[in-house]
Design a protein with these regions (language model features):
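Active-site diphosphate/adenylate-binding microenvironment
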Residues: 6-9, 14-19, 27, 32-37, ...
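Phosphate/pyrophosphate-binding active-site segments
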Residues: 136, 174, 192, 196, ...
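Thiamine diphosphate
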Residues: 99, 108-114, 255, 306-308, ...
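An acidic- and aromatic-residue-enriched active-site/binding cleft used to recognize and process polar
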Residues: 101-102, 301, 384, 435-437
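Conserved structured core elements
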Residues: 215, 262, 317-320, 359, ...
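Glycine- and charged-residue-rich phosphate/anionic-cofactor binding loop of Rossmann-like
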Residues: 130-133, 356, 504
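Generic enzyme active-site microenvironment
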Residues: 158, 297, 380, 433-434
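N-terminal alpha/beta PP-like core and its mobile active-site loop of ThDP/TPP-dependent enzymes
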Residues: 1-330, 368, 372-375, 455-458, ...
Length: 555
């Protein structure tokens, strides 16, 4: 059948099982948006306040479901506004497809109105980017984009479509999309080698990363951890790959991880990294990271092997397939003394009492949210101290229930991510935990929450400062608080009301439970302005480039 390019875009989205897209219209995308109007009974479009919000929403949708998120924009600033969102998705291996409009093909390269070479701009922060100059190539390019986004190490792909390509017609033939190919183990001979290392280990430890969740391998991972009886230390992206209350779950690893995860890293004799990339926020001093251990890396991406930390053995392939292969023929291991030692480390700071404070403490707020929420409810975060408090204190019980910007550390990510997650999973509650600094970045997306009546609970940890940078200034820059005490006087309750959203405020510890309970029960968008002390810090902390021996526990 003969269809316009714009109609082909919509048909290809339907082929791929897309039911929701996030975006913002504009001149170069008018034909596509006109087609979306015709397809509105099949494809829901969520209009955000800003294209960056749309890109983060597509990201949140993808993280919450495992499906490919879709963002659509016009040319020029519409396209450049999603670069941060693509970079955020790229470093965290999140599958997105961005479809941008552009000027007509005869106007390309002429500095036309709202023309920008978005294809070259995003090359460093995408798996691939394509300019479609003929309508005949459009369908196959979009299909290729979706296949690339989900194949191997997942990530974002951009398709740039000039306006005349969306207007021109060509023959369109529907196809059934290929299922993502299984990424087979490339060096299967190493499976037996790693099994022998597991059998010989006395103090094994698993360093679990986001690759487990990306591969939908949480069940296989839990079975593997139980089989080898190894404690699990999770990166920020790996939280949720094993329930937080599982006996083998030790907690978050790295700069702001617990004492117990740092000691497990230092004292283990075998470290198995599953879908984790040894980032600087985890490894610290790379030369001394896991220095007593043989290190095994299980990963889908060959570029990650030995990139940050030198490993003794590695297996390349899909994490799910690797974990299944490692369990075959391997007897159950037992390490009671090692696990008892880790349990002892967990209680290393038990004698330290919570500081007395007239304002709510972050731990009190997060402990209360743990009590209120269900295991399948979703926590989204922005970036800053509140993000690290979530990693330390929130009980993440299932995969795909913690949405956070890991590698890029994108302030302003959380609002869009929460929107995308709530659209993707309307039957689960979504709570955004943010800070006043991050919230100021993309608070315009409150209009999106209200427009679609998305029942997201926004909890603002309001300390009136840029807390994480301020903490570093206190520790490493002689308490010279340069531009981190902004003296803003934003009334977040009134702000929420201005958008038509309910606002609540917490200023005392005894108000935490009743107000948060009320917020979660309202079943509509609500902002909770939770005042905390500007002197509340994220501890313990291992300074950058250091080891557990240099841990900071007090400030």
């Amino acid at each position: 059948m003969q269809l316009t390019g714009a109609e082909i875009i919509c048909e290809c989205l339907l082929e791929q099982g897309v039911d929701t897209v996030f975006g913002y219209p504009g001149g170069a995308a008018l034909n596509t948006y006109d087609a979306l109007y015709k397809y509105s009974d099949k494809i829901r479009h969520i209009l955000t306040a800003h294209e960056q919000g749309a890109s983060h929403a597509a990201d949140g949708y993808a993280r919450a479901t495992g499906k490919t998120g879709v963002v659509m924009t016009t040319s020029g600033p519409g396209a450049t506004n999603i670069v941060t969102g693509l970079a955020t998705a790229n470093i965290d291996s999140i599958p997105l497809v961005a479809i941008t409009g552009n000027v007509t093909t005869d106007q390309l390269g002429r500095d036309s109105f709202q023309e920008v070479d978005i294809v070259d701009i995003v090359k460093p922060v995408t798996k691939a980017s394509f300019l479609v100059e003929k309508v005949e190539d459009l369908a196959d390019t979009i299909r290729k984009a979706f296949a690339l986004a989900q194949h191997g190490r997942k990530g974002p792909v951009l398709v740039d479509v000039p306006k005349d390509v969306t207007a021109n017609k060509t023959e369109f033939v529907q196809t059934i999309p290929e299922k993502p190919r299984t990424f087979e183990i490339r060096n299967p001979e190493k499976v037996r080698v790693v099994q022998e290392m597991i059998k010989n280990a006395k103090r094994p430890m698993i360093y679990a990363g986001g690759g487990i969740i990306s591969a939908n391998a949480s069940e296989e991972f839990k079975a593997f951890a139980e089989l080898i009886d190894a404690p699990v230390c999770c990166s920020l992206m790996g939280l949720g790959c094993i329930p937080a209350d599982h006996p083998l779950c030790v907690g978050n690893i790295g700069m702001h991880g617990g004492y117990e995860t740092g000691m497990a890293t230092a004292e283990c004799d075998l470290m198995i990294a599953c879908g984790a990339r040894f980032s600087d926020r985890v490894a610290g001093d790379r030369e001394r990271f896991g220095e007593q251990a043989k290190i095994v890396q299980l990963d889908i991406d060959e570029k990650e092997i030995n990139k940050n930390v030198k490993v003794d053995e590695y297996i390349l392939g899909d994490i799910k397939e690797i974990l299944i292969a490692l369990t075959i023929g391997l007897d159950r291991q037992n390490h009671p003394d090692w696990l008892a030692k880790i349990e002892e480390w967990k209680h290393h700071f038990d004698d330290k009492k919570l500081p007395e404070c007239d304002l709510p403490l972050p731990q009190q707020v997060l402990d209360t949210i743990n009590e209120i929420k269900c295991p399948s409810d979703i926590i989204a975060t922005d970036v800053g101290q509140h993000q690290m408090w979530v990693a330390q204190f929130s009980k993440i019980m299932e995969s795909r229930t913690l949405l956070t910007s890991g590698g890029m550390g994108t302030m302003g990510y959380g609002m869009g991510a929460a929107i995308g997650a709530q659209c993707a999973r309307p039957n689960d509650r979504v709570c955004l935990i943010t800070g006043d600094g991050s919230f100021h970045m993309n608070l315009n997306e409150l209009v999106t929450l209200k427009s679609y009546e998305l029942p997201v609970v926004v909890v603002v940890m309001n300390n009136t400062v840029l807390g994480m940078v301020r903490q570093w200034q206190k520790l490493f820059y002689g308490s010279r608080f340069s531009q981190t005490d902004p003296h803003r006087a934003t009334d977040f309750v009134k702000l929420a009301n201005a958008f038509g959203v309910d606002g609540l405020r917490i200023t005392k510890p005894e108000e935490i439970k009743p107000i948060l309970t009320k917020a979660f029960e309202m079943n509509k968008p609500v902002v909770v302005d939770c005042h905390i002390s500007p002197d509340a810090n994220v501890l313990p902390m291992i300074p950058p480039g250091k080891t557990i021996n240099e841990i900071i526990t007090e400030m």
